[in-house]
Amino acid sequence: MDVSYPPEAEAFRDRIREFVAEHLPPGWPGPGALPPHEREEFARHWRRALAGAGLVAVSWPTEYGGGGLSPMEQVVLAEEFARAGAPERAENDLLGIDLLGNTLIALGSEAQKRHFLPRILSGEHRWCQGFSEPEAGSDLASVRTRGVLDGDEWVINGHKIWTSAGTTANWIFLLARTDPSAAKHRGLSFLLVPMDQPGVVVRPIVNAAGHSSFSEVFLTDARTSAGNVVGRVGDGWSTAMTLLGFERGSHIATAAIDFERDLQRLCELARDRGLHTDPRVRDGLAWCYARVQIMRYRGYRDLTLALTGRPPGAEAAITKVIWSEYFRRYTDLAVEILGLEALGPRGPGNGGARLVPEAGTPNSPACWMDELLYARAATIYAGSSQIQRNVIGERLLGLPKEPRPEVLC
């Protein structure tokens, strides 16, 4: 396997390193070392700098405001930012650029691309995702939110839950049932809905770590243009699966770098507590190291698929299982190392839910407990590990489908 990058990608890497050196201060520890209000201010400054340098969406086509580069350059940029401990993008950007933006490029109409993509890049449109409902989580096709066509508008009524970035968004992409007479996976449509209207109410949800990273969204006679359907009316399931493929595979470019950085933090924790020679701890650290290497080579595999024009597809399920199960396991090990110290008086945590703590995050019990609690969600959101294993078994290995409960009765 040749894992070297071509000369043009390495030249782009040099450009990114120059940008990092110019915009991050000397001795930069990472945004995790900043108080929350300073972290947010610096992240906004970083976003403006990225936009000014044309680095917000380098692999999007130039006609829609992107850089027109290949996925390889996108990976190079992500690698260098991860190594430098650059601020993570806001959740709205991750949802708008990585997920919805790429889905619009793949499936959207020309009018949708020209209207929405520039506004996503500028930050004028801030997006959240409206998939899960109180009665439809892992069984996403059971959504009950209704969409009814009224002239040239869709009228939407329903209740979404576990909505990331809902409190900071002004648009939501969602699944709604537009044909209740159709089969469960049909009759769904993928709609783009403005949130700045009387029929949309957002209520934050406080999680176990005391942060409000999710929310509920209530839609009562909310309206959106009839043209704001991505894909075909009634074929929203297919559009949603395309988007979830981008979500499940979106972390692999930097997962090995991010988790390797945090593995070093875990090793430091073990040394500080005098447990780095304990056989059980060493076995856990070795397991973590092996999984980081698996993520690294899995990333090369996914990059190869992207460069040949293949969407993530069902293989994204493998990626999602690997990093989410690793996240849970290494935070378990951290709390084992801390012992009763992990249950002591709470100090400042890491400021919210993140896939991987930002560079510079303190090696404190409070931060590790925040990570432990959030790691539980990582094996559930974007499709639970059980669902991912079903996808791997049925769609990649060709195993028989799991029996449905009604068939067993």
From Swiss-Prot:
GO terms for molecular function: flavin adenine dinucleotide binding; oxidoreductase activity, acting on the CH-CH group of donors. Its cofactor is FAD. Induction: Repressed by Mce3R. Its EC number is 1.3.99.-. One of its GO terms (cellular component) is peptidoglycan-based cell wall. The keyword Ribonucleoprotein does not apply. It comes from the Bacteria. Keywords: FAD, Flavoprotein, Oxidoreductase. Pfam families: Acyl-CoA_dh_1 (PF00441), Acyl-CoA_dh_M (PF02770), Acyl-CoA_dh_N (PF02771). InterPro entries: Acyl-CoA_Oxase/DH_mid-dom, Acyl-CoA_Oxase/DH_mid-dom_sf, AcylCo_DH-like_C, AcylCo_DH/oxidase_C, AcylCoA_DH/ox_N, AcylCoA_DH/ox_N_sf, AcylCoA_DH/oxidase_NM_dom_sf, Mycobact_Acyl-CoA_DH. Gene3D superfamilies: Acyl-CoA dehydrogenase/oxidase, N-terminal domain, Butyryl-CoA Dehydrogenase, subunit A, domain 2, Butyryl-CoA Dehydrogenase, subunit A, domain 3. It is an enzyme of class 1 (oxidoreductase). Belongs to the acyl-CoA dehydrogenase family. PANTHER family: ACYL-COA DEHYDROGENASE, ACYL-COA DEHYDROGENASE FADE29. This is Putative acyl-CoA dehydrogenase FadE17. It comes from Mycobacterium tuberculosis (strain ATCC 25618 / H37Rv). The gene is fadE17.
